């Protein structure tokens, strides 16, 4: 990278490493100026609470950012988002399009070049192909049709503008997918946002 520091270092706690040791490494990077800000990626609730508390009292680097999955089909952490926001901690919504499921591309078929068609990647999408997730995707598709916007645009707008969310992370696999994502500019009318929030609960 040809730099002496990174703006944000997201550390991901590993089960085989004590959390205290992980936070000590992050704190060293923060206090030495090698990381301007420190955050946690995909940590458990207890790890998150411990890290934020230690940072708040100065025992370790302050946690300024957290990354975890958050989307219309995975909104179980909504109360955590609100709590973090009240403490000044930003949230990166990972898997904001649920592995592509929230684009609507799996509604009627499984494209041959998709994650769901791959034996190695199917596990990333499978939870979103039936049951509750499918009903949320259908509701999102109906809302998108009414707004004359792509389904993924509406799903991403809901996450992007959710109170407490700092940014939404998506993982395009191709240049075409990236171009499509860059065209997503929807702003949801309040009634649509409220209905989608109810559906996501």
Briefly describe each language-model feature range.
Residues 11-200:
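Beta/alpha (TIM)-barrel catalytic core signal, keyed to glycine-rich beta->alpha loops juxtaposed to Asp/Glu
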Residues 1-4:
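Phosphate/pyrophosphate-binding loops at sites that engage ATP/ADP/AMP, CoA/4′-phosphopantetheine
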Residues 6-8:
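Metal-dependent phosphodiesterase/phospholipase catalytic core, i.e.
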